[in-house]
Every structure is written in C-alpha cells, then in structure tokens.
C-alpha cells in the first residue's frame, strides 16, 4: 500500500474533502485507512463496568485508501 502509518495525507474525495491529517492505522486487506480528525463517527455506548456513564462516543472512522493523497512521508530513522 502506498500509505504508511504516520504519513500526512489530504482527503481528495468524500464529505471531508480538503481536510488534512496523519494516518493512525491501516487495514491492508480492505484497503482502508484511519486519518486523525477525518470522518468522525458517533457511537452510542451503554453504561458498563468499564464505562460507567455510557453516552455518545465520537471517534474516527476508516475511509478508502483511494480517497487520500500523501502530502509528506513519515521520516524513517
């Protein structure tokens, strides 16, 4: 895959077109990436022992790798 974790990318298609962020994770089999601050989704959580309050939790969802363009690569050590 042309994108690696830590690369800075720009979204070129979809509802978040034009936004920039860093790649948090990659799913190679499904060809999808999770970008920080892009494609925010809300999940409703029931109260449980680990999460006593429950409520609405907001996190990043994955987007298809073809919808992002690499701006700068992560510098290797």
From Swiss-Prot:
Disulphide linkage map:
none
Q: Which SUPFAM superfamilies match?
A: Translation proteins SH3-like domain (SSF50104)
Q: Which stretches of sequence are listed as region Disordered?
A: 42-61
The UniProt keywords, alphabetically, are: Ribonucleoprotein, Ribosomal protein, RNA-binding, rRNA-binding
Write down the SMART domains for this protein, in alphabetical order. KOW
Superkingdom of origin: Bacteria
Q: Does the keyword RNA-binding apply?
A: yes
The record's listing under InterPro entries reads: KOW, Rib_uL2_dom2, Ribosomal_uL24, Ribosomal_uL24_CS, Ribosomal_uL24_KOW, Translation_prot_SH3-like_sf
Picking any one GO biological process from the record gives:
translation
Gene3D superfamilies named among the record's database cross-references: 2.30.30.30
- Any keyword Zinc? no
**Gene Ontology terms for molecular function:** rRNA binding; structural constituent of ribosome
Q: Which GO terms describe its cellular component?
A: ribonucleoprotein complex; ribosome
HAMAP family registered for this protein in UniProt: Ribosomal_uL24_B (MF_01326_B)
Please give the function described in this protein's UniProt entry: One of two assembly initiator proteins, it binds directly to the 5'-end of the 23S rRNA, where it nucleates assembly of the 50S subunit. One of the proteins that surrounds the polypeptide exit tunnel on the outside of the subunit.
> What is the protein's quaternary organization?
Part of the 50S ribosomal subunit.
Task: State the family named in the UniProt similarity comment for this chain.
Answer: Belongs to the universal ribosomal protein uL24 family.
Checking PANTHER family in the record gives: MITOCHONDRIAL RIBOSOMAL PROTEIN L24
**Designated name of the protein:** Large ribosomal subunit protein uL24
Q: Which organism is it from?
A: Lactobacillus helveticus (strain DPC 4571)
């Amino acid at each position: 895959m042309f994108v690696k974790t830590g690369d800075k990318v720009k979204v070129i298609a979809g509802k978040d077109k034009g936004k920039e962020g860093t790649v948090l994770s990659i799913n190679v089999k499904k060809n999808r990436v999770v970008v920080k601050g892009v494609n925010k989704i809300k999940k409703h959580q029931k109260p449980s022992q680990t999460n006593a309050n429950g409520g609405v939790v907001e996190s990043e969802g994955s987007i298809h790798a073809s919808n992002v363009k690499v701006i700068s690569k992560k510098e290797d050590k």
